[in-house]
Amino acid sequence: GAFADALPKGRVMLLSNGIKIAGCLMMLFGTHPLMAYAIVGLGAAAYSPAKYGILTELLPSSQLVKANGWIEGLTIASIILGVLLGGQLVGQTMSHKLLSLDFPLIDTSINTAPEAAISILIFVYLAAAWFNTRIPLTGVPMRALPNNLVTLLPDFWHCNTRLWRDRLGQISLATTTLFWGVSGNLRYIVLAWAAAALGYSVTQASALVGVVAI
């Protein structure tokens, strides 16, 4: 959040997508998956405050609830679409088409379905980064990061405590935490169950996860 306030929100989202691309490249070139996932997660964590924070800079307070609803709805839709797309990318049909692509004089060294899928994700993040460059400057004054980042911890604790003590804040935080916590765990449970009980492939199980999510 402090990083999102220190720079224009569009630039923060651009840099965040760059971090995600770096994480994908790390996995593509053999870095331990846990480390690569951590880098991608860092980019996603930095992206979210800017994504929501820019609404307060672009819109009047009377439209924030409506705008937040659109953001939440599109986020959920993108997650479902991402699960379906990921399942298709590692499936035999799509991966065979991707691996059969031949670029003259270019050796991509991409020889497996996961590598092809990660390459497509890199292009998706590049497209998202291009859209980030089209976000206009809002003219809102920036708040510089403190010299000692540790000082952000007491501020975070204070803000978090105030939210949980507020009745409407409690409802919002509890509902959001429950929703994302349950949906995140359910996704992996359905994937594992579909493979063990139904004998589904990753592609088929991903499609089932999309249906369950809807």
Place the predicted regions along the sequence by residue:
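Substrate-agnostic recognition of the 12-TM MFS/MFS-like secondary transporter fold
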Residues: 1-21, 35-91, 133, 171-188, ...
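Helix-loop interface residues and adjacent transmembrane-helix termini in multi-pass membrane transporters
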Residues: 6, 30, 58-61, 111, ...
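Hydrophobic alpha-helical transmembrane segments of multipass integral membrane proteins
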Residues: 18-25, 119-129, 214
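Alpha-helical transmembrane segments of multipass membrane proteins
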Residues: 25-26, 88, 159
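Helix-loop junctions at membrane interfaces in 12-TM secondary transporters
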Residues: 26-37
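Helix-loop junctions on the cytosolic side of multi-pass membrane transporters
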Residues: 53, 57, 62, 110-148
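A single, central transmembrane helix in multi-pass transporters
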Residues: 90-118, 161-214
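Juxtamembrane intracellular "pre-TM" segments in multi-pass secondary transporters
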Residues: 135-175, 197
